[in-house]
Amino acid sequence: MAFARILKACKWGIAASIAIPAVALAQSHPEFVPLARVSAALYRPDSGPAPHIAFLVSHRTANNLNNIACKELAKRGFLALCWNTRFQNNEASVRWEDIAFDVKTTVDYVRSLPGITKVVLLGHSGGSPLMSYYEAVAEAGPNWCKGPDKLIQCTANMDFKPADGIVFPDAHPGNGVQSLRGLNPSVSVASDGTYKVDPTLDPYNPANGFNPEGASHYSKDFQARYFAAQSRVMNDLIAKAQAKMTLIKEGKSTWPDDDLFIIPGGGWSGAGPGSSDLIAMDPGIPELMSTARPEKLLKNDGTIVTEVVHSVAAPEPENAKANRTFERGTKVFTLKSFLSANAVKSTNALSGVDWCSSNNSTMCAVQSIKIPTLIAAMGAFHFIRDQEQMYELSAAKDKDYIVIEGAVHGYTPCKACEKTPGQYSNSDKNLFDYIQKWANARF
């Protein structure tokens, strides 16, 4: 069981931090750096000239001290700081509007280091809304995270200095969007605690197109009903959470500050297994798993072609079992962590997301980010179209979008996707070589 869970996590790259022995060889002497509420590991090149470019790598909750990116970037001549936020391994404690101050701490730190003249933010997975949130506020000012349409507004004084560049390797649109698309709208819990499933909306019902042995194929009709139902469920959850917060403010709740907020069928509280996102079972849905137009594809041999790119992601039928469990299929938040970091308004989970209703939104933030921007989608995962859309929305004049052939979410080769052994063997090398060339050409 434990081994299977590690394999699953590696597929997601949730635990780009799991492979400790391999990553520990990133440099001879990585240095642990305590920075107030932030813990960090500083990676420098073992040889060559002293670096003048620093990369910052983090995730909103995951342990990133041994992230593969720091090893690979240090190996290519950069200084890299891999760090953990104050909310490490505690999804329920997240107060999103405070998290940008942790980015500020690390930006200020690396700018103080001798020889560092440029700072590049690297936002992968849950690090993408983190880094983009900071940068959007740094460039547009604190009014960016305020307003009547926001689920939660920032309130503190935010005096942030912009970075010099930002890289999004397999960024996702935001945790609220991930929660929305991962909801199982067929699930409900009766007042007596009974778990109920509506078979007409059940993504794990073979009558709806589910295949327990491989890739599922959901009809357009089912997809339309499903995406609409996900939106209704999320909006209902938001209304429920807001109503409970009102009771707390009125002194009519059990506790004076916060309360538990549980979402059955929502998937794991962190990223990864248990999600009922249709593309996890049916990787052939083009609206999410293909580019809308010809884009650059970095092939395994290092060449670049331009074509409509389709994800080669493997299906995850095992989510059917995980989604029915408490451990892997139930999100456990508090009212505040849900509303601030894991909710988003919408009219449709596919085509009607209100990107800027949440401050945890890469899609919203890129519209205010003007520093040089590199967006790199992994060709064997779920964010090819999302990242193409980030590129389209980006306010940067200097911006680039590319897909890395055969890479899973954690950058490494998708061996389960290969038709011939070694077909995607260079995926991680190709990604970091491309980042190296991109950064050196600009900074």
Predicted regions and their residues:
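N-terminal cap/lid segment of alpha/beta-hydrolase-fold proteins
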Residues: 26-50, 420-424
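Alpha/beta-hydrolase
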Residues: 199-364
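Conserved alpha/beta-hydrolase
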Residues: 73-90
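Short beta-strand/loop motif that positions the catalytic acidic residue
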Residues: 369, 375-377
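Catalytic nucleophile-loop/oxyanion-hole region of alpha/beta-hydrolase
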Residues: 86-120, 421-429
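Catalytic active-site module of serine/aspartate enzymes centered on a nucleophile-bearing elbow/loop
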Residues: 407, 415-443
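Primarily recognizes the serine-hydrolase "nucleophile elbow" in alpha/beta-hydrolase
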Residues: 112, 118-191
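Short beta-strand element of the alpha/beta-hydrolase
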Residues: 51-60
